[in-house]
Amino acid sequence: EFVNEVQNSNQYYKEFEKEYKNFQIYQKKVAHTLQILHTMCEENEIHYQLAFGSLLGAIRDDGQIPWDYDVDIIIPTQERENFIDCLKHNLPQNFYFYSVEQDSACEHFITRVAPKGYDTHFLHVDVFYVAGLPENQTEAQKYKHEIKELTLLYKAKKFDFRNKKTSSKKELCNMVAYRIKGTLKKTDDILSRYNRIATQYPIENSQRYCLADRFSDWYDFPSCTVF
């Protein structure tokens, strides 16, 4: 259906079918990566579920969104340590993961899993972590703000201004501002603070949850919708 839509649109070009077949090969590799993670999580009783576009694709398209190149899943922050430990000991040798626990150069708090031989920037399963929220709305807003601030401070500390390709000038300016803001803060202290804050409110004891990263104020959902 997607291919037919493109063929009948003004976006169609001569090499589309050939390029899309190549693209589907990468989609299959990502889907296989998800299968590996699914087995690992089931065997180790780690709670996870599809999220965002990946969840939409599973429901609407009975698989991946036709033009989506990655898969997104969410895991409770309380299970992060166990999940990372499982990746270290149980992930097949032909796969690898990228996270702050595995690579000191990592600038974000999500985890990416990919087949070896592929850059996690381009082919991956994105693992986002979610945290419960305090019941008081004002406290919940403060909590989400602190998670966002810690995430951006950490990213700015690790940001490579010499070699990094930024998506926009706004992103670059944002990183400069947070680098200055975090001048007197140690990277390890930011990470330790984040780990304490992100696990403060277990989802099972909370009515709502948010993403435990820079998009914490974008995603705020009832806890009954997960796990």
Residue ranges and their predicted role:
Residues E1-N4, E15:
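Non-catalytic N-terminal targeting/anchoring module and adjacent flexible stem/linker
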Residues Y12, K18-E42, L87-E135, A140, ...:
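Conserved catalytic core of two-metal-ion nucleotidyltransferases
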Residues H38-V71:
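Active-site nucleotide-donor binding segment shared across nucleotidyl transfer reactions
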Residues T77-R80:
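Helix N-cap motif at beta-to-alpha junctions
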Residues N82-D85:
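Conserved SAM-binding loop
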Residues Y143-E149:
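Short, His- and charge-rich active-site/binding loops that engage polyanionic ligands
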Residues L150-A156:
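A short, surface-exposed interaction/processing loop segment used at functional sites
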